[in-house]
Amino acid sequence: MKSSEPASVSAAERRAETFQHKLEQFNPGIVWLDQHGRVTAFNDVALQILGPAGEQSLGVAQDSLFGIDVVQLHPEKSRDKLRFLLQSKDVGGCPVKSPPPVAMMINIPDRILMIKVSSMIAAGGACGTCMIFYDVTDLTTEPSGLPAGGSAPSPRRLFKIPVYRKNRVILLDLKDIVRFQGDGHYTTIVTRDDRYLSNLSLADLELRLDSSIYLRVHRSHIVSLQYAVELVKLDESVNLVMDDAEQTQVPVSRSRTAQLKELLGVV
């Protein structure tokens, strides 16, 4: 019997459909903000996740969070990214149309959130913002193991990366990723045959990737050693050729050259 599914539907697209269905079953966190980005209301999910963050990062009790700038509830390294999202405008100038969702990591607790903001309009015009987020931590990470001695818990280990493509959220398998390249507010994720944009920073990724497989060879590059092809020396610099569609030569910083050679078994 022939399948009724179009031949053009890829495995990745089928996985995206399955994940999208799961996402629809989630109870989202919802935060209402006024025109200045100050919190006016939470639903129960948002309070459960952001409440502890406010208590530990700001020393503010949950019942005192109302009226606080929502940016302050996130780690300092994530604040510029969130502020950029809240201030984003539609390229066509539409005051209602909202930017696409972003992935963001918060440290207290250690969670991965997909965040969407929508401008709200009342009879008198713009009146604030509705922020909706989905906690995709359990779909994208796993515990990294027990910390040694009484030390602080290690960040959870990533096994999938959430990205936004064609009006849907897709989870990329780490094993399919050749390299990551940092570029301003975004990180470009490169597979053998495609590229994706992610809002997760290289610093966030580096903490949550297996260091025996993924190495930050340069301030702007993390590579999967499984896709390394060749080390190329050019004058005083060293590049690593990666097995993506362009056979990209990734620069290797001097401080990482010896470590990279050791991991690759190169003398």
Curated annotation (Swiss-Prot):
Residues 161-266 form the HTH LytTR-type domain. It is found in: Cytoplasm. Binds 1 heme group per subunit. InterPro entries: LytR-like, LytTR_DNA-bd_dom, PAS, PAS-like_dom_sf. Residues 15-86 form the PAS domain. Keywords: Activator, Cytoplasm, DNA-binding, Heme, Iron, Metal-binding, Repeat, Transcription, Transcription regulation. This protein undergoes a ligand switch upon reduction; the heme distal ligand is coordinated by a Cys residue in the inactive Fe(3+) (ferric) form, by Met-104 in the inactive Fe(2+) (ferrous) form, and by CO in the CO-bound active form. One-component, b-type heme-containing aerobic sensor and transcriptional regulator that responds to CO by activating the expression of the oxidation operon cox. The N-terminal sensor (heme-containing) domain is covalently linked to the C-terminal, DNA-binding response domain. Binding of an external ligand to the heme located in the N-terminal sensory domain displaces the Met-104 distal heme ligand, triggering a conformational change that activates the C-terminal DNA-binding domain. This is Heme-containing CO-sensing transcriptional regulator RcoM 1. It comes from Paraburkholderia xenovorans (strain LB400).
